[in-house]
Amino acid sequence: MEKPTIILATSNGVGMGHLARASAVALALKEVANPIIVSMAGGIAEIPDFMGIRCEYIPGKDRMWMSREKWDVYLRDRLLALAEETNAKVLSFDGVIPYPGVIAAKNANPDLKLVWVRRGLWQKKPQRFVLGLQSAMMDKVIEPGDIARAYDFGPTATRKEAVLTAPVSLFRKEDAMTREEARKALGLDLNRPTVLVQLGTGEGDVNEKMTAALSGLLGWKDLQVILTKAPVDKDGKSLAPEGLDLKVARYFPLAKVLHAFDAGICATGYNGVHELLPAQVPTVFVSNIRGTDDQEARARWCNDFGFALRADQADLADITAKVKMLQDPAVRQRLSAKCAELPDTTGGQEIANMLYQLATAPKGKKSSGLTYKRLLVQDRISRGSRHVIMLGLRRLALVYRFLHPHIKVQEIDQAPPVFGEQATAAELHPLIKSSTRFEHLISGASASYRKRREEIAFAAYGKETVITKTK
């Protein structure tokens, strides 16, 4: 029997959580199906090298290469074209909110089974009001387990439509490198103590948290500090105090080399918690309170039950003090030993099994046209007054052009996007980060698929408007 194709789509969320979960599911699917990962996250560049799985990068709406309305249609058409090209039976979406384009793809192709992998521990954000409508459009809703689920009091906690699995993680004891192997892979000294720092930079308070955390490492003899991104602000100014031996290292998946580290400092995202703690890395969590993820709830659970230390993200002195506690070998030993009690992270295999069952089932759920229309209306409302204002400004511009015919509007073709089937991180990273519009194709794409993709790109990017005044 031919292996079914399953598309695993992810949003461009904060951190690598969505992409890491999709990767764990894809690895579990490889023996029985043909998984394809599509994502708006730049980290997708690492997937082909690591997993040998076909993937496609989709530029997100945050690139601002087209209007929001055009991007919704663009995403729908990209997903439909990929499903037709690969004869995919299932489209799984891992993200906080299923984009209108994702749901529109299901509405346009009812035979395509749609699954929402919906992480729990939501903060009480406005997105909660459309949970029921979005869930009703799905063939299945799956909630990847969270070790801190007992502290989940958000809007998804009491809903009944989701199937709960064990936690999902790319960390697997049987695949992880030994301490020596991991340190050699990262180019580290084999004997010096080593700390991993996974904190973001950007806004002022985020930068201050990075500095506060690194300050807690001062005085740790012979320490080497590994960061996943350079500790600099937007102007290139260092956020690190003097006196630390710092190194920036990129390795995917980081889960394979976690045994290299004596301790970790990390945001309390799903991915960080479910990799560092199963790997028994003594960790201080500094929560990122932006976004939908209730990182503070997860951090409190980890701290209250002795699996990690929680730093008060609003108190820089507390961040420094909690990190300094990691210098005590007894503290590190206690945290590491406690983490051995955590449950197995087998959720990736559980989700893979459910997706495979759907892919081999005869028919999917027929979604309600009324539900879809209600969801469209709600989406318009949720975009709020800004959307209404923009529509009004467009109308005023049309009136102004009618009243002032001396202003001519000329439309010219924009430079065509770059199409390619690149499949290595070295090739993909520069293209994804570039200001040039990049249209990524799965390896082995057919001529008809490329033609369809060119049509989709032209419709989305269209023409550039140039206004010239003439007397």
How should these model regions be labeled?
Residues 327-406, 461, 471:
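C-terminal amphipathic helix plus adjacent low-complexity
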Residues 177-263:
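Donor-nucleotide binding loops and adjacent catalytic segments primarily
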Residues 2-14, 28-81, 312:
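Conserved nucleotide-sugar phosphate-binding/catalytic loop shared by glycosyltransferases and other
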Residues 9-21, 204-206:
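A short, glycine/small-residue-rich beta-strand->loop->alpha-helix junction that serves as a flexible
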Residues 305-310, 314-331:
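C-terminal "capping" alpha-helix adjacent to the active site of nucleotide-linked donor transferases
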Residues 119, 124-125, 134-201:
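A nucleotide-sugar donor-handling region in carbohydrate enzymes
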Residues 80-97, 439-443:
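Short N-terminal targeting/anchoring amphipathic segment
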Residues 93, 251-297:
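A donor-sugar binding/catalytic signature common to diverse glycosyltransferases
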